[in-house]
Amino acid sequence: MALTLTDVKRIAHLARLEMADADAERTLTQLNEFFGLVEQMQAVDTTGIAPLAHPIEQILEVAQRLRDDVVTEHVNRDDNQRPAPAVQDGLYLVPKVIE
């Protein structure tokens, strides 16, 4: 898949982006290089290969990189709702906007 300069300008217009011609040409080159890489990866025969969530774990013993899920700060609902103009049962009351 290869994009044209017209495609890039159309996409920029749809995204409401102002793009100079030089920027559009540079973006076109970068996108086409990216799509070329994707085509190369799609050409690789992966028949019989199971998908891996973390492929590096297959070749290295890696410790879990994610931190423990622990509470680091406590939220005091009453303090947060004190400046609100209207609160009821721990919920913010707002004006009805859709009838």
Curated annotation (Swiss-Prot):
Pfam families: GatC. The keyword Nucleotide-binding applies. It catalyses: L-glutamyl-tRNA(Gln) + L-glutamine + ATP + H2O = L-glutaminyl-tRNA(Gln) + L-glutamate + ADP + phosphate + H(+); L-aspartyl-tRNA(Asn) + L-glutamine + ATP + H2O = L-asparaginyl-tRNA(Asn) + L-glutamate + ADP + phosphate + 2 H(+). GO terms for molecular function: asparaginyl-tRNA synthase (glutamine-hydrolyzing) activity; ATP binding; glutaminyl-tRNA synthase (glutamine-hydrolyzing) activity. Its EC number is 6.3.5.-. Keywords: ATP-binding, Ligase, Nucleotide-binding, Protein biosynthesis. One of its GO terms (biological process) is regulation of translational fidelity. It is an enzyme of class 6 (ligase). Heterotrimer of A, B and C subunits. Allows the formation of correctly charged Asn-tRNA(Asn) or Gln-tRNA(Gln) through the transamidation of misacylated Asp-tRNA(Asn) or Glu-tRNA(Gln) in organisms which lack either or both of asparaginyl-tRNA or glutaminyl-tRNA synthetases. The reaction takes place in the presence of glutamine and ATP through an activated phospho-Asp-tRNA(Asn) or phospho-Glu-tRNA(Gln). NCBIfam families: gatC (TIGR00135). HAMAP family: GatC (MF_00122). Belongs to the GatC family. This is Aspartyl/glutamyl-tRNA(Asn/Gln) amidotransferase subunit C. It comes from Burkholderia thailandensis (strain ATCC 700388 / DSM 13276 / CCUG 48851 / CIP 106301 / E264).
